[in-house]
C-alpha cells in the first residue's frame, strides 16, 4: 500500500528540499519539458552541508502505517543521484559552495545522508522503500549527453 504521493507537490523536489542543506528555489522554467499541464517551475540548490535530520516524510510514512494495519506499506523517495542531477548537472549556473569544491565531499555527504534516510525509515517500520531514479534517461539520450 502507498499513500499515492498525494501529500506531495512534486514527486522528487519535496523530499530533497527537506534534506538539511538543500533549499527549494523558484525557477523561470523546468530543466525538462513536460507534455500537457505545466506545473510551476522550481528547482533546488545546495546551500550547506547535505544531511538528514527531522524530515516530514517520516511522519507521512508513520501515518500510512497507522492506517494500513498489517498491510505492507511502500514509501517512495527520489534516489541520491537525483539530488546531484538537479543541483549540479542541470543547474545552469551551478557554483559549488565552499564545502563542496571537491565533488567527492558532496558525494560522501549525500551517501551518509541516504544511509541515515534508509535507517530512519527502517526504524519507523518501513520494509519497502523504493528509490525512484529518472536520471538514467539523461544518459540514454544522445542529445542530453551532449550537454554534459
Predicted regions and their residues:
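Domain-level signal for soluble alpha/beta catalytic cores
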Residues: 1-148
Amino acid at each position: 500500500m502507498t499513500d499515492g504521493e498525494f501529500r506531495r507537490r512534486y514527486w522528487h523536489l519535496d523530499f530533497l528540499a527537506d534534506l538539511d542543506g538543500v533549499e527549494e528555489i523558484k525557477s523561470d522554467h523546468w530543466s525538462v519539458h513536460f507534455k500537457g499541464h505545466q506545473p510551476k517551475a522550481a528547482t533546488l540548490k545546495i546551500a550547506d552541508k547535505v544531511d538528514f535530520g527531522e524530515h516530514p516524510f517520516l511522519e507521512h510514512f508513520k501515518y500510512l502505517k497507522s492506517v494500513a494495519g498489517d498491510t505492507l506499506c511502500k514509501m517512495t523517495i527520489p534516489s541520491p543521484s537525483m539530488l546531484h542531477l538537479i543541483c549540479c548537472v542541470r543547474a545552469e549556473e551551478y557554483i559549488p559552495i565552499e564545502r563542496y569544491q571537491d565533488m567527492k565531499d558532496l558525494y560522501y555527504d549525500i551517501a551518509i545522508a541516504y544511509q541515515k534516510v534508509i535507517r530512519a525509515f527502517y526504524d519507523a517500520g518501513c520494509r519497502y522503500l523504493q528509490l525512484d531514479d529518472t536520471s538514467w534517461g539523461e544518459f540514454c539520450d544522445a542529445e542530453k549527453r551532449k550537454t554534459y
